[in-house]
Amino acid sequence: MSDKSSQLLAQQPIPAAFCRLAIPAVAAQLINVFYNLVDKMFIGHIPSVGKEALAGVGVTTPVILSISAFAALVSMGGAPKASILLGRGEVEKADRVVGTCTWMLLLLSLLLTIIMLAFGRPILLLFGASSKTIPFAATYMGVYCLGTAFTQLTLGLNAFITAQGKTLVSMGNVAAGALANIVLDALLINGIHMGVAGAAWASVVSQGVSACLVIRYLCSSRSDLRLRIRAVRFDGTLLWPCILLGTSPALMQLTENLVAISFNTSLQTYGGDIAVASMSILNSVMQFVMLLLPGLVQGAQPLLSYNLGARNIPRVKKTFRLLLLSCLAGSFLIWFLCMTTPGLVASIFTNNAALIAYTSWSMHIYLAMLLIYGIQVACQYSFVALDQAPTAIFLTIWRKIILLIPLIFLLPHIWPNPAMGVYLAEPIADTIAVCTTAPLFLRYYRSLG
């Protein structure tokens, strides 16, 4: 490992190292959100069909998130494993982890592409496409799936750059793809008038740009983790532990769709269109939370994993304490803004007075326990970074599948105001989850010595 990287992860004061790693990681999350918004702006302004085109592309979002979850399955377990091996000084074995994870990402890309080409239309109909939106959704997805390999390699392998403590490089790879996407959107949608197909091709090419940059870096001498052609092969002894560790982050992404469908279905029944619209605004607020907190976690992950491998336990503990304080501060800040100025927050997303009033009410309920959500994020993701796969998987299943989804459907039947009962599912699940996660992590923290 290069002296510069080793010094950053093993010797530099924790606050300075954490900031140096976390700021680019948060910036990368912000860039992703920004270019997704710009993408939708271009699509929404397609002459005469903008509304239907935007709705059609919106239907593809859960499918695209599901595809991305498979990259997380491989990389979010493989990257911490590789970082731990770097900390132990087992560089050759760490390179083999990169190789076998690349092999798996390529295999998943092939399988997902075949599935989407063969069954894309019925899958989109299952996710809510209508007779008006299915032509746009199918067109977009038909092109997008051709670039699945680029998406998998960009998301999957960029994590191995972050794992070295090179978050500025990984942010640059994301930024280059985002810039290419915006330029190509303008050219293909507004210039050549390719419509939704143009937006899809812009996404494919931009992901290709990012993938090339990621691969070039990992193959270069600047990278502490090297992608070597001879290592791109199946190695079950290395791959399966990575998959097990990555199961928790992948489940987090996959279950987001199920949670969203559950909320929308229940709110439509008990609150009508205004409740569903309000939920859309609340989800947008949570996007900002999930922009900040995972960025902080990505900054801490290399420090946690590398120093665990090096058995520098005091440094592991200091990193976690700083991560916990940062996540708590971030979640508290957003909670405070939402609790004190809910109308102002809602008005960012709509100018409808009735919807602003309703969202101000629902925001106080839905985000009531957001102030402690930072504990859940810091502990759960740290379990992944510290190679505690079974606990991380349990906590993911516990919060979303065992607690949240059943509560969404149960509480409306026992609460006087059924719609309020639906919104209450979130803070109740958050509270129980934190009360479970915090003691589990405290016990592990003490066991480190």
Label the predicted regions.
Residues 1-24, 82-149, 191-247, 304-369, ...:
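Short alpha-helical transmembrane segments in multi-pass integral membrane proteins
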Residues 10-41, 45-49, 62-81, 106-113, ...:
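N-terminal transmembrane alpha-helices
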Residues 19, 34-35, 74, 115-119, ...:
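Residue-level signal for transmembrane alpha-helical positions in Major Facilitator Superfamily
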Residues 20-39, 143, 177, 206-210, ...:
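Transmembrane helical elements of multi-pass membrane transporters/channels
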Residues 30, 34-55, 124-131, 187-194, ...:
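Helix-terminus/linker motif at the lipid-water interface of multi-pass membrane proteins
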Residues 51-62, 137-141, 200, 273-288, ...:
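Small-residue hotspots at the loop-to-helix junctions and early N-terminal turns
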Residues 54-114, 151-170, 278-336, 340-342, ...:
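Small-residue-rich hydrophobic transmembrane alpha-helices
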Residues 144-162, 170-178, 199-214, 294-297, ...:
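Short runs within selected transmembrane alpha-helices of multi-pass transporters and secretion channels
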